[in-house]
């Protein structure tokens, strides 16, 4: 077992004692004992931050085990008994200057270490404590004796065990003691003392090795900062460690520690005893959790290692398979080579057989010839020598053939060597290719992750934008509701105070005749006012002429009136003008009248120059044109003097056509015969002026009202009929829209005339609307989705099926979108049926 990290820190609230001052004593605890005495930890709540207050253990003396050399069978049994349970030792107060390798070697001097665990902090720095697991309890006892309070650098090492480990050590020592009691009574105290001497001798030997190890690390321990161990120094330490390992290890007598019963036997307060028990239980639980977490991490590491080994084995099997294939290929090559060798050997055998046959034949020939002449002996001897020479030549040829064969064999061996090199190179290339593929896959994964993060970011931006839009829409809707409530309140008050007799003439119109009669009355009143004003002006002119000393003011006024009438009369043409001259003249008049129209304000409605009519002739009721307003005064006077207004285009007359006296009055006869021609001549320039600015101002200002011609007749009737038709059409459209249901069930159940839904209607009305709504909902154009919705509509699909398909893309906006689209479809089909649209 191991101690949790929180037991390695000083308790909060208790100040540290100065060096050299012993810690305070608590009731029920004896004073501190010399170093080397086995100790147990005191709980944190009663422990000072100075050297830890420890309780001395109760010595338990067991009987000696006898001479081991006289009982070899007993020696094996003793070795089995020494291998007790694994025990964990808490090592604390480790100096920062002491390297982890030094602590490992110190722990290894005391016995076989199964594991050494030292916690790393958040910064990666090793903590000042750790947990060492020994294979045998004997090693644990030796570590407690030799390493506790060992001076390392500026600190003393702290070595402890917990209560559970103490219980295991007590059990192990009890077994050892029982084995000692079961031995014969012939065992003497001298043997036990010799065994104690052996243990002390071994402890002294290990202690000397520890001192040598500390002297070896003295440069690091005395250095101002911790330095990492160099590679040569590690080799030197390992050599010295091997030297000390070669010494024989003597068995260690069990040294019992204090048990839980001993703690209960100590005189102390009840709450402190309970606190100690709780601290021990908490320590066990914490260590158990740490062990479970470490076990999980170890399992994960083993799984990863297992997968890595599986991949290595798979790669190794692949290499072995390729090697076996190459080996089989080489084996086939060797078999072929052996077959060729056997074939050559058979050829040689055949050659030798033929040679022997020839030799025998020659021998027979020689035998036959031997009985012939001696003269032939020489020839035979020469033949024989030639045969021997040929035989030697054949032998040399065979030797050369064998040499060539050996050369070919060496060449094949070199070829096999090159093949092996190629295989190794191919393996390296495959490994590099695997590494490249792995890096490529990792890069793709990173790119996918980056793309996902980018899409996520865009989606979040769009969602935030939509949220803001929804909030603004909610605010606008709330504002509209407030306005409607305010308007309803105003209308309620208005209707409560409404009086039909008093307010109907103000808010309702009668027939056209009544309207024109009222306009005529107003016009007559305006004419009367104009006559009065003209008389006043004439009187003013006469007074001015008298003030200037004119002899005959009346004659002067008459002369001015005649001059104005003469200017109004058309000139007599000597010869007809050509069409080009007429066009030039018309363009000049247009240019002359354009500044007049440009000076008018945009809000003023265009009107034609009023026609000069004699006051004596009473106009008909229908003479009030649509352009005439009740506020427009008449321009005639009894004497024929016309007073121009600010809307009159005759204000732009040249200076020479005005009276010399400087008055802004225009004189003229009331019954001028050339007046209709002048009106006809000026109709076209005025229309052209308005047509010129109509296109430019159509986007910025409202369209100007169409001018009504002065010649009232069929045109007036048609205009009135057109106005009525427009009003009726607007009423039809409004009633049609009101008839279309707004609730989804009634809207989807509305019968739709699919025969009217054609490609022309789809392209002109439905598709642009769908595209605009998709851009509004998604934020970008989505041609595929638009085509899909249009195809579903052209396929006469039900609105619910289209809603189900579109809901996967538009989510909660899908229902609103389909409801609006279906209302548009119903409106277009119904409007086309009744002729509202073409």
From Swiss-Prot:
Positions of the RRM domain: 87-164
The keyword Mitochondrion is annotated on this UniProt entry: no
Biased composition (Polar residues): 669-678
UniProt xrefs under SUPFAM superfamilies: PWI domain (SSF101233), RNA-binding domain, RBD (SSF54928)
Keyword Nucleus carried by entry: yes
GO biological process: apoptotic process; mRNA processing; regulation of alternative mRNA splicing, via spliceosome; regulation of apoptotic process; RNA splicing
Modified residues (Phosphoserine): 225, 228, 578, 672, 678, 698
Segments of skewed composition (Pro residues): 12-30
Gene3D superfamilies: 3.30.70.330, PWI domain
Highest taxon above the source species: Eukaryota
Single Gene Ontology MF annotation: mRNA binding
Broad class of where this protein is predominantly found: nucleus
Locations listed in the record: Nucleus speckle; Cytoplasm
Keywords on record: Acetylation, Apoptosis, Cytoplasm, Isopeptide bond, mRNA processing, mRNA splicing, Nucleus, Phosphoprotein, RNA-binding, Ubl conjugation
Post-translational modification: Sumoylated.
Function text: RNA-binding protein that acts as a regulator of alternative pre-mRNA splicing. Involved in apoptotic cell death through the regulation of the apoptotic factor BCL2L1 isoform expression. Modulates the ratio of proapoptotic BCL2L1 isoform S to antiapoptotic BCL2L1 isoform L mRNA expression. When overexpressed, stimulates proapoptotic BCL2L1 isoform S 5'-splice site (5'-ss) selection, whereas its depletion caused the accumulation of antiapoptotic BCL2L1 isoform L. Promotes BCL2L1 isoform S 5'-ss usage through the 5'-CGGGCA-3' RNA sequence.
Assembly information from the UniProt record: Interacts with LUC7L3 and SRRM1. Specifically associates with functional splicing complexes, including Sm proteins and U1, U2, U4, U5 and U6 snRNAs. Associates with exon junction complex (EJC) proteins, including APEX1, DDX39B, NCBP1, RBM8A and RNPS1. Interaction with NCBP1 is RNA-dependent.
Protein name per UniProt: RNA-binding protein 25
Source organism of the structure: Mus musculus
């Amino acid at each position: 077992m191991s101690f949790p990290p929180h037991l390695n820190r000083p308790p909060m609230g208790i100040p540290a004692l100065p060096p050299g001052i012993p810690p305070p004593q608590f009731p029920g605890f004896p004073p501190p004992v010399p170093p080397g005495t086995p100790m147990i930890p005191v709980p944190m709540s009663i422990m000072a931050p100075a050297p830890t207050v420890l309780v001395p253990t109760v010595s338990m003396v067991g009987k000696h085990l006898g001479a081991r050399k006289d009982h070899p069978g007993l020696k094996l049994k003793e070795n089995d008994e020494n291998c007790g349970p694994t025990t964990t030792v808490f090592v604390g107060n480790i100096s920062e200057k002491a390297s982890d390798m030094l602590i490992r070697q110190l722990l290894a001097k005391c016995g076989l270490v199964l594991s050494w665990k030292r916690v790393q902090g958040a910064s990666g720095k090793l903590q000042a404590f750790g947990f060492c697991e020994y294979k045998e309890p004997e090693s644990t006892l030796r570590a407690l004796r030799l390493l506790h309070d060992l001076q390392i650098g500026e600190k003393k090492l702290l070595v402890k065990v917990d209560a559970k480990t103490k219980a295991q050590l007590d059990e192990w020592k009890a077994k050892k003691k029982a084995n000692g009691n079961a031995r014969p009574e012939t065992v003497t105290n001298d043997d036990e003392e010799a065994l104690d001497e052996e243990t002390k001798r071994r402890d002294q030997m290990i202690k000397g090795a520890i001192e040598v190890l500390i002297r070896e690390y003295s440069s690091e321990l005395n250095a101002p900062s911790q330095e990492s161990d160099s590679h040569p120094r590690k080799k030197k330490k390992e050599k010295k460690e091997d030297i000390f390992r070669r010494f024989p290890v003597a068995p260690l007598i069990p040294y019992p520690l204090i048990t839980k019963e001993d703690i209960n036997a100590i005189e102390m307060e009840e709450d402190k005893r309970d606190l100690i028990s709780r601290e021990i239980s908490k320590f066990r639980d914490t260590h158990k959790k740490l062990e479970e977490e470490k076990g999980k991490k170890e399992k994960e590491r083993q799984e990863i290692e297992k997968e890595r080994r599986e991949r290595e084995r798979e790669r190794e099997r692949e290499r072995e398979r390729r090697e076996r294939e190459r080996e089989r290929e080489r084996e086939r090559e060797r078999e072929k080579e052996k077959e060729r060798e056997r074939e050559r050997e058979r050829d040689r055998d055949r050659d030798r057989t033929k040679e022997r046959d020839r030799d025998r034949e020659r021998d027979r020939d020689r035998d036959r010839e031997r009985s012939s002449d001696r003269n032939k002996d020489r020839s035979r001897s020469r033949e024989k020598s030639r045969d021997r020479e040929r035989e030697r030549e054949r032998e040399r040829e065979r030797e050369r053939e064998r040499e060539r064969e050996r050369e070919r064999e060496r060449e094949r061996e070199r070829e096999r060597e090159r093949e092996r090199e190629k295989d190794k190179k191919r393996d390296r290339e495959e490994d590099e290719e695997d590494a490249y593929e792995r890096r490529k896959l990792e890069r793709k994964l990173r790119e996918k992750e980056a793309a996902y993060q980018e899409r996520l970011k865009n989606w979040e931006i769009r969602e935030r934008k939509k949220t803001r839009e929804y909030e603004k829409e909610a605010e606008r809707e709330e504002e509209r509701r407030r306005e409607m409530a305010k308007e309803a309140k105003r209308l309620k008050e208005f209707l409560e105070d409404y009086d039909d007799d008093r307010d109907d003439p103000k808010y309702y119109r009668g027939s056209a005749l009544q309207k024109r009669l009222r306009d005529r009355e107003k016009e007559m009143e305006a004419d009367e006012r104009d006559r009065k004003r003209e008389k006043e002006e004439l009187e003013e002119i006469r007074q001015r002429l008298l003030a200037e000393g004119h002899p005959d003011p009346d004659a002067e006024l008459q002369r001015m009136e005649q001059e104005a009438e003469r200017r109004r009369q058309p000139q007599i043409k000597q010869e007809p003008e050509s069409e080009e001259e007429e066009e030039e003249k018309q363009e000049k008049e247009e240019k002359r009248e354009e500044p007049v129209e440009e000076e008018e304000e945009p809000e003023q409605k265009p009107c034609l120059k009023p026609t000069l009519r004699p006051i004596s002739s009473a106009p008909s009721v229908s003479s009030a044109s649509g352009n005439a307003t009740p506020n427009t005064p008449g321009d005639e006077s009894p004497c024929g003097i016309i007073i121009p207004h600010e809307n009159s285009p005759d204000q732009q007359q040249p200076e020479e056509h005005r009276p010399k006296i400087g008055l802004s009055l225009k004189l003229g006869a009331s019954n001028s015969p050339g007046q209709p021609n002048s009106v006809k001549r000026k109709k076209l320039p005025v229309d052209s002026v308005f047509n010129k600015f109509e296109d430019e101002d159509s986007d910025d200002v409202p369209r100007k009202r169409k001018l009504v011609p002065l010649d009232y007749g069929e045109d007036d009737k048609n205009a009135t009929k057109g106005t009525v038709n427009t009003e009726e059409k607007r009423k039809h459209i409004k009633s049609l829209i009101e008839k279309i249901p707004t609730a989804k069930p009634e809207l989807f159940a509305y019968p739709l005339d699919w025969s009217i839904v054609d490609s022309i209607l789809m392209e002109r009305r439905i598709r642009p609307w769908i595209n605009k709504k998709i851009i509004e909902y998604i934020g970008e154009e989505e041609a595929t989705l638009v085509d899909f919705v249009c195809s579903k509509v052209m396929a006469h699909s039900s609105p619910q099926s289209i809603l189900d398909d579109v809901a996967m893309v538009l989510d909660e906006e899908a229902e609103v979108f389909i409801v609006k689209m279906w209302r548009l479809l119903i409106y277009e089909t119904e409007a086309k049926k009744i002729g509202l649209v073409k």
